[in-house]
């Protein structure tokens, strides 16, 4: 553990000068544009500020505020010392200065729901400018209003329940087996890397019909790895920096997408039905009036969204299950039952009915998302003055609904830092999943993750084949940390042992 923390701390120290320079540049530019210094007061006049009952809190250091403390590395199964101390001192709603802006931080389940349900009326999505610079101005992550609704509608139609059943379920199972069949008995490897390989190949296939293992697919994957390092780095566009390299990789990735688009347009113009490909690229070209730039950003952002969070959630599930043999046993029993029913039907592939029978599997998925918190918090901006629980939150301020703080709240979840999938078992006769209005792993409201059902399908199918065919243990100690996104410092090294078919059928 000490070595792990030392490694993470050294990375933080390496990036501190870059982060500080970026913040200084941002502050200098912003303050110069503001008149009368109102920026420092969140755009409120002294008279207005005097009438307001702002949440308690502190501004932190000049220029940098409390950003460094907020982003300090900590285990993914905790909210971190910064949040713990601030909640203890100020309560679940407090003010701070983060990412160069006056900010209200919410660890309150009710306020978080209120924020997500009032998207476009009182709040709007507001990610740092550098995110838009690297994902593209037409990325769904940064769009607001009608443009976001149009992009989201295209994604939802492509990921409809009909397509999930008929197209995506077989594809998910095929890509799962491609990964698992390559695992050698008693071999050791990075589970996180394998999860990334699985989700990337799946998304590349369904976005642009790129097959796993092909040279172009592997080249795209390498560029994507460089691209991702820049997404989580300081936004300094200087030669040699991760952000600069990521922008170059973005251009290379867009070049691949653009070539695929040109090839597809040519095929469509010839009306060659034999070469029609049922992927997102074809869907966007035929089902929308999007411009070329919009399609490029849409495909890049969905490659990012559909790969990164799903792979981390899957790695977290493997990690949590390794430490809970009882859950693995119940999971295996559920999937042995499904496999037996498959054989009785004379089938060898999963059906949609099989998927809907994975009740305990969904409990495991929910608990993984609750405890691991792949998406820790969301960036929002207040667009109208808000009054909530006696506090005034001024228009123009940033507000961060911290989903992880709610999911790890002991007043909402008993023993919240323990992996307990049984907490999601319904106590009713229906045998379904227990519901919780405070559980928001995919966000909510009009910006609810368009790929949430696909993400759950991916995890369920992968776990089905994993527990039927393998046992596993950690090859060396590792655990997920937040820095600033969730990651395993060592890549989650595991050793796998294949289960004999006779054992599987018992």
Swiss-Prot record:
One of its GO terms (cellular component) is membrane. This is Steroid (22S)-hydroxylase. Signal peptide: none annotated. One of its GO terms (biological process) is brassinosteroid biosynthetic process. Pfam families: p450. InterPro entries: Cyt_P450, Cyt_P450_E_grp-I, Cyt_P450_sf. Heme binds at residue 449. It comes from the Eukaryota. The chain crosses the membrane at residues 12-32. The lineage of its organism: Eukaryota, Viridiplantae, Streptophyta, Embryophyta, Tracheophyta. The gene is CYP90B2. GO terms for molecular function: fatty acid 2-hydroxylase activity; heme binding; iron ion binding.
